[in-house]
Amino acid sequence: MLIKELITRTEKEYMIITLLKHYKVEKVKVKYKSMKDYAHYNVDTGTLELSSRYKEIKPRQMKEFLITILHEIRHAMDAKKYGWRKFKQMYEMEMNMISQGHYPGKDDPYKDNKYEIEAESFGLKNMPRWKSHFSKK
């Protein structure tokens, strides 16, 4: 039921809470913020920031929305696993190594960052399962 029509803010919050609990990062705070992307995980504050621009999610936007949320949850899982300071340090070290040319063929500190690649892969891999799960509700 959730995905057949527009996804309201309440349904969106239910989906996010379900995902946070499933991946055992339920202590992550969720807040709305004006931004272009659907979501961003702020490692400094342990906050999943959701875009206030997308009050409702259309069915055609659902895949991208779920991939993004799962991607950001992966960052939260890494922050929990390593500790937020250590994860931030590792992430920034990876960005610096790419920027300084230590990895041949890699030149974009964001897109070529192994933590971003892992998070995107996690989102793509898990999206079909959750899309199906939320479609049945």
Residue ranges, per PLM feature:
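Active-site scaffold of zinc-dependent metalloenzymes
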Residues: K29-K63, A76-K80
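Short, hydrophobic alpha-helix immediately C-terminal to the catalytic nucleophile
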Residues: I16-I17, H75, E120, L124
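Zn2+-dependent metallopeptidase catalytic core
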Residues: L6-E26
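Catalytic Zn2+-binding segment of zinc metalloproteases
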Residues: E72-Q89
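Metalloprotease/metallohydrolase-associated module, dominated by Zn2+-dependent proteases
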Residues: Y23-K27, W84-K137
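Nuclease and nuclease-like effector domains acting on nucleic acids or nucleotide cofactors
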Residues: M1-L2
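Hydrophobic (often cysteine-bearing) scaffold residues that line and stabilize catalytic clefts
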Residues: T8-K12, M62, L66, K111, ...
